[in-house]
Amino acid sequence: MASDYTKGLSMKAAKLVFENLPSSYENGANDPHAREEMHNASCMAGMAFANAFLGLNHSMAHKLGAFHHLPHGIANAVILTRVMRYNAAEAPVKMGTFSQYPYPNALAAYAEMARYCGVEGKDDREVFENFCAKLEELKATIGIKGTIADYGVDEAYFLESLDEMVEQAFNDQCTGANPRYPLMSEIKELYLDAYYGREPQDYACLLYTSPSPRDR
């Protein structure tokens, strides 16, 4: 449900985060300007999603917090680029529930934000891949770990609670506003990929066909 109004806020917020989060994290009170800009970025991002709503990334993060007590920021960050790749598929099984556009456009929207943040590439797909790499670099800079398992989430309990987590994420209020409407089997694969650190997929037409959740 993004609009020209929310895009301006979200794009500026993202740029401020890239420019100021590393120093705010590293230097704290010794860099008050970076802290100020991060407060501004947080406020602008809130203004954007209060009007455009959120999506699957937040739905999945809500359940990681509820079931496994991951702080919400960490839960969002650890799955972020995987959900972005899922959303950026140009031939999804189902589109979003809100008819905002006649065809999938998440890839172009991600590329637009990426270019505003200084990311380059020969086409939208390359820009998007470079954007994901830039996000992973930022996450590493501030100590975000690579997988759900890295945060000490017990494997047996993760697998035991997975189906309930998937169902609750599917029914979360944020899911309906995602640009690509997910199947529960797709949410399950995203969780498993993020837990085990499996190689990212393009998620173009993802159905749950894995022989084992431990297949990495």
Language-model-derived ranges and their functions:
Residues 1-52:
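Carboxylate- and glycine-rich phosphate/diphosphate-binding segment that chelates Mg2+/Mn2+
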Residues 2, 15-17, 39, 63, ...:
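Glycine-rich flexible loops
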